[in-house]
């Protein structure tokens, strides 16, 4: 899930998902939606990745094989 991956990366970078939202200029309410399982738009993923200095692919959870 996107939120879990984001949270893990944020912990390693000593920040929070809410702080990242504020830094890139989007509403903190997005965090609540991500916690519910929604995924952000691609441009948001890219902005978050740039802010955290990670690859956008790192933020996108891999699909589990059946």
Regions found by a protein language model. Give the residues of each.
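A short, Lys/Arg-rich alpha-helix, primarily the initiator
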Residues: 1-14, 19
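Residues within the alpha-helical elements of helix-turn-helix
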Residues: 12, 23, 51
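Residues in the helix-turn-helix
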Residues: 19, 30, 58
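Short alpha-helical "recognition helix" segments of helix-turn-helix
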Residues: 19-21, 48
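Recognition helix of helix-turn-helix/homeodomain-like DNA-binding domains
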Residues: 25-39
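DNA major-groove recognition helix of helix-turn-helix
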Residues: 35, 52, 60-63
């Amino acid at each position: 899930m996107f939120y879990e991956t984001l949270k893990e990366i944020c912990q390693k970078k000593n920040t929070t998902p809410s702080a990242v939202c504020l830094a890139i200029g989007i509403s903190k309410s997005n965090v609540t939606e991500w916690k519910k399982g929604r995924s952000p738009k691609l441009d948001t993923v890219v902005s978050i990745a740039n802010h955290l200095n990670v690859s956008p692919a790192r933020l996108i959870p891999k699909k589990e094989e059946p």
